[in-house]
Structure formats: structure tokens, C-alpha cells
């Protein structure tokens, strides 16, 4: 009897957990769809502003800017975009592993790294390393918006401008589809001239103000929005990964409940058989008397 009660309690607990994972799956689906719309709406802007910068520099090849300077690398900066919450599979783990390999590659060349971290999971993982964390933002406590990119971006821009860091990278999970999120590390600074000069057709613009001031503004805006767009990509990836993880948990709980139900039915059947045997034995004993 105690075994039946124990199995029944297990089934009840797993059923309650199943309801939670199913609810989290549905919430993640809703959040992912909203995030995907927001993410996709930002891609055309990022592409257009990059094309404008490309065309400007292609037609002003003598123009020099600190963000275009190629210099010897002594220290790098990495902006890491992670999540605040778990229950999203191995999304953070695969990204962190890629970042660790990336940092180690530079450490082998005696090049140090400074980190800027967005998300609690990134902070809890990388704070144990010897790398200096120059900036941190908590999504949960601060509703992350484009204005937050100004803080994250401005710190490394100053460090890069004064020569404290020589390269700046951005690490995040790129959203490709619901089932595929790609851990990515891209170079923000210096801007690659090879990529800039890849266009076959170029045209120049008529500038109402100083063209150099305009380019400086465009470059800063491009870098800020690149970080913001990456945060949208990572957030969409998080919701997709959590949706899949919760779906797998729900499916696994169904299988576990099914197995426990078989054990419960067998135990109950054995118990009924034992009771019937006792009744029959008792009746036989009475009839003999």
C-alpha cells in the first residue's frame, strides 16, 4: 500500500511540474514571436547605415578615422551578451566556451582582454576569471533599451580612442531559426576596410554639414545599434532555446508519467490480487470449519 501511495505522489508532483513547463513553453513562444518581429525590424536599418558608411569611405579614401586605424594588438575588449535567466538549454554554455577559446588564443600571444558583460549569467561565469570587467548591465533590474547601448558602447569607445584597447569584439548568439542559434564573435573595431570596399558601384552624397562630423556620428550610431541589434538577436535566441528546452521537459515528463502509471497499475493489481487471495483463503478456512 505504501508503494502505491509513493508512486501516486510522484505522478502528482511530475504532473504539476509538467503544467509549469508547458506554461513556460507557451510564454516563450509568445515572447519569441514578439522579439523576432522587433529583431527583424532592426536589420534593414543596420544594413542601410552600413551601406552609407561604406559609400562614404569608398569615395573618401584619404579620410582617416581612429575607428579605421590598424595597429599592433596589445589588449582587446569583448562585449559579451548573455541571458539573465537559465532554463534555456546550452545556449549560454556554447557561447561561453567559444569566448574562452577566443580569449585563450589571445592569451597565448600575451594579449590581455577586458570584458563588458550584459546579463547575469555572463557575470556569474566570467567574474571568476582574471579578466577585468569594465561594465555590467542587468536585464532583470534594468529594462534593457537602446539607451543602455550608449553606456556599454561609450566606455569601450573611450578606451579604444585613447589606445587602451586595440581591438573590440562583440560576442552573442545569432538567431537563425527556432531550432538554430549560432554563437558568434564579430569584430567591431577597427572597421574592416576589406569589407568596406567590397561594393562594385559607389556614389557620393551632397552634405549639408561637415562630412567628417557626419561620418563620426554615423560610425558611433552604427556601433551602438550593432550592439543593440545583437542584444535583440540574443534575446530571441534565448526565448527559442527556452521554448525547445521546456517542450523537451514537457515531453519527458509525459514519458515519465506513463512509466510511473504502469508501475502504479501493476502495484495496484498486485495489491488487489493479494486481497482477493486473502478473502478466498479466509472463505475456504471458514467453510472447512
Swiss-Prot record:
Question: What is annotated about its quaternary structure and interactions?
Answer: F-type ATPases have 2 components, CF(1) - the catalytic core - and CF(0) - the membrane proton channel. CF(1) has five subunits: alpha(3), beta(3), gamma(1), delta(1), epsilon(1). CF(0) has three main subunits: a, b and c.
Instruction: Give an example GO cellular component term for this record.
Output: proton-transporting ATP synthase complex
- What job does the chain carry out? Produces ATP from ADP in the presence of a proton gradient across the membrane. The gamma chain is believed to be important in regulating ATPase activity and the flow of protons through the CF(0) complex.
Q: Which species does this protein come from?
A: Buchnera aphidicola subsp. Melaphis rhois
How this chain sits in the membrane, per its record, is:
Peripheral membrane protein
Q: What is this protein called?
A: ATP synthase gamma chain
Taxonomic lineage from the root: Bacteria, Pseudomonadati, Pseudomonadota, Gammaproteobacteria, Enterobacterales
Record GO biological process: proton motive force-driven plasma membrane ATP synthesis
NCBIfam families named in the record? ATPsyn_F1gamma
Major place of localization?
Answer: membrane
Any single GO molecular-function term of the entry would be:
proton-transporting ATP synthase activity, rotational mechanism
Keywords assigned: ATP synthesis, Cell membrane, CF(1), Hydrogen ion transport, Ion transport, Membrane, Transport
As for family, the record states: Belongs to the ATPase gamma chain family.
Q: Where in the cell is it found?
A: Cell membrane
Amino acid at each position: 500500500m505504501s508503494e502505491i501511495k509513493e508512486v501516486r505522489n510522484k505522478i502528482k508532483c511530475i504532473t504539476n511540474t509538467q503544467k509549469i513547463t508547458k506554461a513556460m513553453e507557451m510564454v516563450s513562444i509568445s515572447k519569441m514571436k514578439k522579439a523576432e518581429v522587433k529583431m527583424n525590424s532592426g536589420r534593414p536599418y543596420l544594413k542601410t547605415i552600413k551601406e552609407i558608411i561604406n559609400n562614404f569611405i569608398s569615395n573618401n579614401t584619404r579620410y582617416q578615422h581612429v575607428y579605421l586605424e590598424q595597429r599592433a594588438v596589445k589588449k582587446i575588449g569583448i562585449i559579451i551578451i548573455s541571458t539573465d535567466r537559465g532554463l534555456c538549454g546550452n545556449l549560454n554554455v556554447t557561447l561561453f566556451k567559444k569566448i574562452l577559446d577566443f580569449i585563450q588564443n589571445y592569451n597565448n600571444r600575451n594579449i590581455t582582454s577586458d570584458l563588458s558583460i550584459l546579463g547575469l549569467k555572463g557575470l556569474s561565469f566570467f567574474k571568476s576569471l582574471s579578466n577585468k570587467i569594465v561594465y555590467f548591465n542587468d536585464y532583470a533590474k534594468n529594462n534593457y533599451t537602446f539607451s543602455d547601448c550608449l553606456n556599454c558602447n561609450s566606455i569601450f569607445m573611450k578606451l579604444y580612442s585613447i589606445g587602451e584597447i586595440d581591438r573590440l569584439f562583440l560576442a552573442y548568439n545569432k538567431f537563425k531559426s527556432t531550432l538554430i542559434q549560432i554563437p558568434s564573435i564579430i569584430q567591431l573595431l577597427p572597421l574592416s576596410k576589406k569589407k568596406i570596399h567590397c561594393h562594385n558601384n559607389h556614389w557620393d552624397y551632397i552634405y549639408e554639414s561637415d562630412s567628417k562630423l557626419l561620418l563620426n556620428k554615423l560610425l558611433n550610431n552604427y556601433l551602438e545599434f550593432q550592439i543593440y541589434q545583437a542584444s535583440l538577436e540574443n534575446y530571441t535566441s534565448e526565448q527559442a532555446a527556452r521554448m525547445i528546452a521546456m517542450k523537451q521537459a514537457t515531453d519527458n515528463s509525459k514519458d515519465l508519467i506513463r512509466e510511473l502509471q504502469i508501475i502504479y497499475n501493476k502495484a495496484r493489481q498486485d495489491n488487489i490480487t493479494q486481497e482477493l487471495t486473502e478473502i478466498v483463503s479466509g472463505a475456504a478456512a471458514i467453510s472447512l470449519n
